[in-house]
């Protein structure tokens, strides 16, 4: 190979002209950055990671004094530890796009704790849309002041940055320098980020850990290591130590493995110091043979013409950057083959006379330390009159062999130390596990004793209360026996309702639970008879729902109301002899094979109430029964009717308004039946003390009206439903007001409903959402108002179904704060001392198989044989398609649904042809105070039901 080919790199020789022209600047800068890496990371052996040397960088090496040259930013100096935490810095810079893309693009950068993140805009950073992240502590940073350029080399990529103004450039350089030093200091100090810092990188024996090892009587003292804490003596142990602690102390004092490990580490450290010296000698010996003069190289570089640069690239004989990869020769050296001390002295003398001190510090490619030097220049090695080439080669080989032997010793010592630590680790695990096992047994025994003591006390208290109840029950001999439902087969059978005793048991249970449960007032349940489905389902649930610290012990208004209605025969139609059902006859059908897109694609943005749906998408309830389902927690209104504080009454009414939405949480997979015009529904609940009826008063637009009355309250509403399908979701927009009156205080509350949205209509798991604002007002008093907000789920808010509200007095001051979730409960106050106002009851078993119905919803469509003669023929319980779906007969349900809808269309056509108008039977239209049409009860339903009965009243044929 000719002399001209010696300085030509392989990359220059093999690169094509096209590739060279596309990325000439990028490849040259990448080569420069790689050279800078080698400059900052001093060549190390395989046992010392390069990152530790990169973090502890030498003084900055200016590449040129001119303003247009690159300058390497210095890193953390050895011994520099007091780096203050920098402030966060952000702003826009220009970033050069990676090859093959071109041009500078504006990006927003954020520098925080040594990490440089960038994105297109500040909003993207807030959203977490980061385009890239750079650890400036592990990057090589170089700047070019004249061009206002900043380059960050992370080994994987080179980031080219540019700043428009000089002030911004100086600010960014200052901040990057500070963050870089801080990040490097954190990496050195943190064992997690710098696990390779086992031994301090020092060059003097005084500062090395090996110097801290003391030898007494020929044995190594482990306490001399700075990282090893002194072993505790027996005198330092407390007198009341447990057996496990004594075992730990004995293990710490008697263990020999740790002493052996400390001794191995001491020898290993000595060998490492020897390896470090050998490595320096190897580097010195290698550079004494090939180190050129910087002045000559710069002069030669200037004289090179452009024509010479275009000469075809040739391969270099050997890359100088690979000098760091020392080729170790296998096999130990022969005895007496060389003298290490004499060879080191000769090498030191040669270095002192010929090699500059700066050249002895880093064995790198010389053009890397100064980019102004040409990388392709031929370096002529000056003749050396101090060292013989053959002798230097022999010394170099012997140093390599010695280096290999000592490295093998270090490896074996480290392996032995690791085995010792592993043995001690297993011992410590056994001791700690035994200690934890004993401690766990003692803790469990203490808990069992405490639980047993509490159970004994509770048993004694319950026995005393049971005796008191028994004694009082024997005194109270009179029992109200009412023949609620006479049976034709057994005319003498009666259902005995022991009102005084049941009321007494309820009061006792309320007392016992209020002592052990935290304060909250939930839906009040009155334990009356075996006909209550909640009592049969779960006694504990009825007790818990009856708890309230604010309920007086002599509060018997609901019980008196129910007993009065039972005695007067007003609620006989709702009494079920065998109790209410707890499960539907058949589970819900599979709807996975229904293609909703074919049904809904032509109805986007339209009202879906006019679109006929497959019966499989329905649930065996209709909208009129849904209105009754909102009365599930009517006990909140009963409680409000007994609360004197107007602010607390408003809180209870607000809780009732929220409770009407909880049953919809598991019902997103199906929709209720649309009532036909003139359809009705009634519900009498003796256990809750109310009677309810509803009617479909209009078909286009669909309007449903209902009325519910009790001794403590009157509730009514008329709702107009509007359904909108938007492709992936469906919105249900209710229009109307809800009304509640409390006769005892003369209060009249009104409020509105919020928007309901069902997501993932066509695919995925459907889920329901309620959002909007609700304003509750007492039109008879301006003492306070309540504002509730059903929070809408958005991209940045992960909390779903949240409800927030406040009760405000006349002056606008917040009296009560409300918060919670509409499917979990509502709380009043500030957490964690907030008081639970309402909490939903438990769901029945396998509710997901039965349309997600609650216990109350399961009972709504139940038809007792005795009720058939008492209900009007327009009642929803008689609707055939709904009944077939409940029983699981899909074919019959689909056929009946089509027949019922066609029958309604024919009635509408007949009325339009004859100019007839439908007149609701049980509701009338009025104009309220807001000049809005409203539907209220005409007070004829219960009168007709009582006399002469619906069987004797003409009713339209709906199915």
Curated annotation (Swiss-Prot):
Regulates cellular transport and efflux of cholesterol. Plays a role in phosphatidylinositol-4-phophate (PI4P) turnover at the neuronal membrane. Binds via its PH domain PI4P, phosphatidylinositol-4,5-diphosphate, phosphatidylinositol-3,4,5-triphosphate, and phosphatidic acid. Weakly binds 25-hydroxycholesterol. It comes from Mus musculus. Residues 14-29 have a biased composition (Low complexity). This is Oxysterol-binding protein-related protein 6. Its main location: nucleus. Residues 86-181 form the PH domain. It holds the Pfam family Oxysterol_BP. The modification N-acetylserine is found at residue 2. SUPFAM superfamilies: Oxysterol-binding protein-like, PH domain-like. One of its GO terms (cellular component) is endosome membrane. Gene3D superfamilies: 2.40.160.120, 3.30.70.3490, Pleckstrin-homology domain (PH domain)/Phosphotyrosine-binding domain (PTB) (2.30.29.30). It is a peripheral membrane protein. Homodimer. Interacts with OSBPL3. Expressed in skin, respiratory epithelium, small intestine epithelium, pancreas, striated muscle, brain, spinal ganglia, and nervous plexus of the intestine (at protein level). In the brain, specifically in the cerebellum, it is expressed in Purkinje and granule cells. Expressed in hepatocytes and macrophages. It comes from the Eukaryota. Residues 42-53 have a biased composition (Polar residues). Keywords: Acetylation, Cell membrane, Cytoplasm, Endoplasmic reticulum, Endosome, Lipid transport, Lipid-binding, Membrane, Nucleus, Phosphoprotein, Transport. The keyword NADP does not apply. Residues 1-60 are annotated as: Disordered. The modification Phosphoserine is found at residues 35, 190, 290. The keyword Cell membrane applies. Induction: By acetylated low-density lipoprotein and dietary intake of cholesterols. GO terms for molecular function: lipid binding; lipid transporter activity. It is found in: Nucleus envelope; Cytoplasm, Cytosol; Endoplasmic reticulum membrane; Cell membrane.
């Amino acid at each position: 190979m000719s002399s001209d080919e010696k300085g030509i790199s392989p990359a220059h020789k093999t690169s094509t002209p096209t590739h060279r022209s596309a990325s000439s600047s990028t490849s040259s800068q990448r080569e420069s950055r790689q050279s800078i890496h080698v400059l900052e990371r001093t060549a190390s052996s395989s046992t010392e990671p390069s990152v530790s040397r990169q973090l502890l960088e030498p003084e900055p090496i200016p590449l040129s004094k001119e303003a247009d040259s690159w300058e390497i930013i210095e890193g953390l100096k050895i011994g520099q530890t007091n780096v203050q935490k920098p402030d966060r810095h952000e702003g826009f810079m220009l970033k050069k796009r990676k090859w093959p893309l071109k041009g500078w693009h504006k990006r927003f950068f954020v520098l925080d704790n040594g990490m440089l993140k960038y994105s297109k805009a500040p909003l993207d950073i807030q959203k977490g849309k980061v385009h890239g992240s750079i650890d400036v502590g592990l990057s090589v940073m170089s700047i070019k002041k004249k061009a206002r350029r900043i380059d960050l080399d992370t080994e994987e990529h080179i980031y080219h940055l540019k700043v428009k103004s000089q002030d911004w450039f100086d600010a960014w350089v200052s901040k990057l320098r500070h963050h870089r030093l801080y990040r490097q200091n954190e990496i050195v100090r943190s064992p997690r980020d710098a696990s390779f810092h086992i031994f301090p990188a020092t060059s003097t024996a005084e500062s090395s850990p090996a110097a801290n090892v003391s030898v007494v009587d020929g044995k190594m003292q482990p306490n001399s290591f700075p990282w090893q804490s002194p072993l505790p003596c027996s005198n330092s142990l407390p007198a009341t130590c447990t057996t496990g602690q004594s075992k730990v102390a004995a293990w710490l004092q008697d263990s020999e493995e740790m002493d052996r490990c400390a001794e191995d580490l001491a020898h290993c450290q000595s060998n490492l110091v020897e390896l470090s010296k050998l490595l320096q000698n190897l580097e010195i010996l290698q550079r004494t043979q090939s180190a050129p003069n910087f002045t000559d190289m710069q002069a030669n570089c200037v004289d090179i013409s452009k024509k010479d640069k275009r000469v075809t690239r040739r391969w270099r004989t050997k890359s100088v950057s690979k000098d760091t990869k020392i080729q170790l020769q296998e096999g130990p050296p022969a005895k007496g083959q060389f003298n290490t001390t004499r060879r080191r002295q000769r090498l030191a003398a040669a270095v002192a006379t010929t090699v500059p001190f700066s050249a002895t510090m880093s064995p790198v490619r010389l053009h890397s330390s100064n980019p102004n030097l040409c990388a392709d220049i031929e370096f002529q090695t000056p003749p050396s009159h101090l060292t013989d080439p053959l002798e230097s080669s022999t010394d170099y080989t012997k140093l390599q062999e010695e280096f290999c032997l000592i490295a093998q010793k270090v490896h074996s010592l480290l392996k032995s130390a690791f085995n010792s630590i592993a043995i001690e680790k297993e011992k410590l695990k056994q001791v700690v596990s035994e200690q934890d096992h004993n401690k766990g047994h003692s803790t469990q025994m203490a808990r069992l004793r405490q639980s047993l003591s509490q159970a004994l006390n509770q048993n004694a208290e319950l026995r005393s209360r049971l005796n008191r109840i028994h004694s009082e029950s024997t005194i109270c001999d009179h029992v109200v026996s009412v023949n609620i439902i006479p049976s034709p087969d057994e005319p003498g059978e009666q259902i005995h309702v022991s009102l005084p005793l049941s009321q007494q048991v309820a009061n006792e249970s309320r007392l016992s639970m209020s002592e052990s449960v935290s304060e909250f007032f939930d839906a009040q349940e009155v334990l009356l008879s075996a006909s209550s489905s909640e009592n049969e389902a779960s006694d504990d649930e009825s007790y818990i729902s009856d708890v309230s610290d604010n309920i007086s012990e002599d509060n018997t208004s609901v019980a008196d109301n129910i007993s009065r209605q039972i005695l007067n025969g007003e609620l006989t139609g709702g009494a079920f002899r065998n109790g209410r059902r707890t499960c539907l006859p058949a589970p819900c059908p599979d709807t996975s094979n229904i293609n909703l897109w074919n049904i809904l694609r032509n109805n986007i943005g339209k009202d879906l109430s006019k679109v006929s749906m497959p019966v499989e998408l329905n649930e065996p309830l209709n909208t009129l029964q849904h209105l009754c389902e909102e009365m599930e927690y009517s006990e909140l209104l009963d409680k409000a009717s007994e609360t004197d504080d107007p602010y607390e009454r408003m809180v209870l009414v607000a809780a009732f308004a929220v409770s009407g939405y909880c049953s919809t949480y598991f019902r997103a997979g199906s929709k209720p039946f649309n009532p036909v015009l003139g359809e009705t529904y009634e519900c009498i609940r003796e256990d809750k003390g109310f009677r309810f009826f509803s009617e479909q008063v209009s078909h286009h637009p669909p309007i449903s009206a209902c009325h519910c009355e009790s001794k403590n309250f009157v509730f009514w509403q008329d709702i107009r439903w509007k359904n909108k399908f938007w492709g992936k979701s469906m919105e249900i927009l209710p229009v109307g007001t809800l009304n509640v009156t409390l006769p005892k205080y003369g209060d009249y509350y009104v409020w509105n409903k919020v928007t309901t949205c069902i997501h993932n209509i066509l695919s995925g798991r459907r889920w329901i959402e309620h959002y909007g604002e609700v304003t509750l007002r007492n039109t008879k008093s301006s003492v306070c108002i309540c504002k509730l907000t059903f929070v809408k789920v958005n991209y940045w808010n992960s909390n779903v179904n949240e409800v927030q509200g406040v009760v405000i007095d006349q002056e606008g001051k917040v009296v009560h704060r409300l918060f919670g979730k509409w499917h979990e409960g509502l709380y009043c106050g500030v957490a964690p001392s907030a008081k639970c106002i309402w909490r939903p009851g438990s769901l029945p078993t396998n509710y997901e198989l039965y349309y997600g119905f609650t216990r109350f919803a399961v009972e709504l469509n139940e038809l007792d044989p005795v009720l058939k003669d008492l209900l009007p023929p327009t009642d929803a319980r008689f609707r055939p398609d709904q009944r077939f779906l409940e029983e699981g007969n899909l074919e019959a349900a689909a056929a009946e649904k089509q027949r019922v809808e066609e029958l309604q269309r024919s009635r509408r056509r007949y009325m339009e042809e004859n100019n007839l108008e439908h007149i609701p039977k049980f509701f009338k239209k009025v104009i309220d105070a807001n000049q809005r049409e409203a539907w209220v009860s005409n007070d004829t339903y219960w009168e007709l039901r009582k006399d002469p009965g619906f069987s004797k009243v003409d009713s339209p044929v709906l199915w």
